[in-house]
Design a protein with these regions (language model features):
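S4-like RNA-binding module at protein N-termini
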Residues: 121-161
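Residue-level signature of catalytic and energy-coupling elements of molecular machines
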Residues: 23, 124, 180
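Non-DNA-binding regulatory cores of transcription-related proteins
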Residues: 156-179, 187
Length: 194
């Protein structure tokens, strides 16, 4: 599936939030906390539609999903039982790249996406190289043996020791495995880390 490859800091400044979780975006928002462009400082009053659009774009860029894929997630969430917004959150949080990010094996979602694409992880003993793969409750994700000593993964695990793993994940840093327990905790809006 495709991904966004355009200017990241510009998008973060437009939205007013560092959606790509990089240091460059933090610094740019600190130095220039206004939208990019010639008329960026002259901010017009935001309408309700503008606020809703900005929040949708924030979620879309955070999870690395393009517009059509996001629309498909929304359609699927509206068909499911329950509140559509919560269902959408569950669908986005249960993506394989997001589960790896939430488990603390990657420092950002784009990094998790790349690690999945390069086949560094197994899902229930089989290689999966699709970042948007939906992880179900009870699935076990493990780092393949040849990738266990990758500097990127090791550094993220070492530096993220104080990171609180969500309760819907069971992480074993010694075996380098993750098991999804249940997504019911997500209904209570438990998101510990953007």
């Amino acid at each position: 599936m495709a991904r966004y490859t355009g200017p990241r800091v510009r998008v973060s400044r437009r939205i007013g939030f560092n959606v790509f979780e990089n240091r460059k975006g933090d610094k740019a928002l600190q130095d220039r906390p206004y939208p990019p462009g010639e008329n960026g400082r002259k901010r017009a009053r935001e309408t309700d539609y503008g606020t809703q659009l900005k929040e949708k774009q924030k979620v879309r860029y955070m999870y690395g999903v393009l517009e059509k894929q996001f629309r498909n997630y929304y359609k699927e969430a509206s068909r499911m039982n329950g509140i559509t917004g919560e269902n959408l959150l569950i669908l986005l949080e249960s993506r394989l790249d997001n589960v790896i990010y939430r488990a603390g094996f990657a420092s950002t979602r784009p990094q998790a996406r790349q690690l999945v694409s390069h086949r560094h992880f197994k899902l229930n003993g089989k290689f999966v190289d699709v970042p948007s793969h939906q992880v179900k409750a009870g699935d076990v994700i493990e780092i393949k043996n040849a990738s266990q000593d990758l500097i990127v993964i090791q550094h993220t695990i070492d530096t993220g020791q104080d990171y609180v793993v969500p309760s819907w994940l069971d992480v074993d840093n010694k075996k380098k495995t993750v098991k999804t327990v249940s997504y019911t905790h997500l209904r209570a809006h438990e998101t510990t880390r953007y």
